[in-house]
Amino acid sequence: ELKKTETIDVMDAVGSNIRVDTYDWEVKRVLPRINEEINEEWISDKTRYACDGLKNQRLDTPLIKNNGNFEEISWQDAYKKIKEKISITPPDKIVGLTGDMTNMETMFAVKNLFQKTLNSSYLDSRAKHTYINFENRSNYLFNSGIEGIEESDLILLIGTNPRFEATILNSRIRKTYLKNKTEIFSLEDVGDLTYPYKVLENNSKVIDKIIKNEHNLSNKIASAEKPIIILGQSILNSKNGAYIFEAVSYTHLTLPTNLS
């Protein structure tokens, strides 16, 4: 009696392949789908059990704010209200903001609505002011691929705790350590990651020294065949996020390496 829907997990940035089993409007369980390039046959506990909170914390009705309080309204009334507001608001005063859990199809539809219909380019999806340079596609992709972690011989973690933020990715790092004894470094002590790693001094000067070939790690990165640098959300949200992001992006220009 369960309806089975194949989809992608949104609990982290890994994009694990999953199957969601539903009965009527209720999500009953979430199971992994095999994808050797991403999650293999695994999913994290967060992915598996997040549906438990949907019964009491699921928004499936539009809300409108009146006198400081949110009230439920019908979809038809919501669209009417949106149309009224848009008709009396100049394009340069209309802003679109999509949430972290918004799917790509919806985001693309919102982009078309703003650019082609409303003549507005004020769109964003970064509620936390995360710095990302979109000029180069490699700036926002995981360039080695999740599966490519297993081929890496050096990994540098900057501002991330992969065990907490992306469990499946962390399991890949552990796998490559056990298989290849890969050297792993972190800009800060983030606790037990289930594999050993060396902690560097936690400040942006260390990154600067590495880029300028003035740090012991510079030679290791340069001599590694497939080094990987992984940037986390916390570092991109920090005041030094823009500098660190751009500095790391140009590492392959200052160090002779095949960096991912």
Per-range role (PLM):
Residues 210, 247-248:
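Short amphipathic C-terminal alpha-helix that caps PH/PH-like domains
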